Amino acid sequence: MRRDITQWYSERLYRDMPIVSYGHYGPPVLMLPTAAADFLEYERFQLMGTLAHWLDNGKAKAYSVNSVNTLALMNKQTKPREKLEWLKRYDGYLTEEVLPFIKNDCGGVDVKPVVMGISLGAYLAANVFFRHPERFSGAVLLSGTYDIRGFMKGHQSEDLYFNNPVDYLANMQDGRDLRELQHGGKRIIIFTGQGAYEDPARSRQLAGILGSKGIPHQLDVWGQDVNHDWPWWRKCVPQYFGQLFGT
């Protein structure tokens, strides 16, 4: 499998930010890591090998980047306003740095990636997707949480509202973003298990909000033996690649 690593200094995040790509060409998928992990996490946990059929045959090309979870949501020493500032900066990094890089890497065509994330990465993927639906063709959200108020120690602000998908989606009124989500042909896949450390209520809540807004989506709730762990994600992600990019 072709594998290339690039990095550049991000003025938004004040640090070098690496990005790894897998495959030669094909529709792009932007993969955001779980919790405190880094851009090579999907490779270390052997997920990329399960996608070789698509990545080696030009059916898809995958990109993975670092997150800011250790600076933001998972940083217990940081005040809520600072956490939200990091999330805003990360949103700018993804939309104004990573997406242009992917476009250039794909030959300059106006590509719209699928964005994917697992666990806290699913939150990051959902947030950038629902805030900028015109920039993406779909989202694959695995075992995620879509309400970050539990990380905010009771803090309330406009910045929290606009970075909390269950809030701003529930109140989304007729407008460009809602029409894009309703009629833009997006593929939204929400996955959860019901086993150890999974919380299917979070995925059902997001799906319920999308349904109430007439936003097409797919909710997959797997069994009570399906835990919040890599063996199950290695099983479901190839299935979703098959749905998105063909077998």
List each model region and its residues.
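Non-catalytic cap/lid and distal C-terminal segments of serine-dependent acyl enzymes
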Residues: M1-T247
